[in-house]
């Protein structure tokens, strides 16, 4: 929607409410942590798009801070800042910008896996899941990237290498 008045009238309030729920917390232990990143899940639950559960067994447990959720969170904050600025809500724009900066710094500190030169899949406390999954592609494909061009290229290369291996093994 390019009509700012319609966005302000019909969407902006709802979007603000969604952000507020992520900040204060909602069901399934979904909440913003002190570092600005989103944490989600409890033991035995699957919440993200790739989690699988058979009976009581969570096949790909990803409780904690998921890479794609936090890439989407950062982009949501940047979009909210843009919309607020366009609507002359400068205080709100500044608040969203400040939180986005905090998220970006935390994302770099927490998710970048220096040894492997790609992004951790998920973080739960001190547990860093270094499984190479396509989820990290979200961090390089959204309108507001948090990584340098070199890091973005490396993420794409690592995911492609992994997919090529899987295709080769299965062919």
What are these regions (language model features)?
Residues 8, 62, 66-69:
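Alpha-helix N-cap/helix-initiation motif
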Residues 24-65, 102-171:
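Extended glycan-interaction surfaces of carbohydrate-active proteins
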Residues 1-16, 26, 84-101, 143-157:
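Structural helix-adjacent loops and short alpha-helical linkers that scaffold large soluble proteins
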Residues 75, 98, 132-134:
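Short acidic alpha-helix initiation/capping motifs at coil-to-helix transition points
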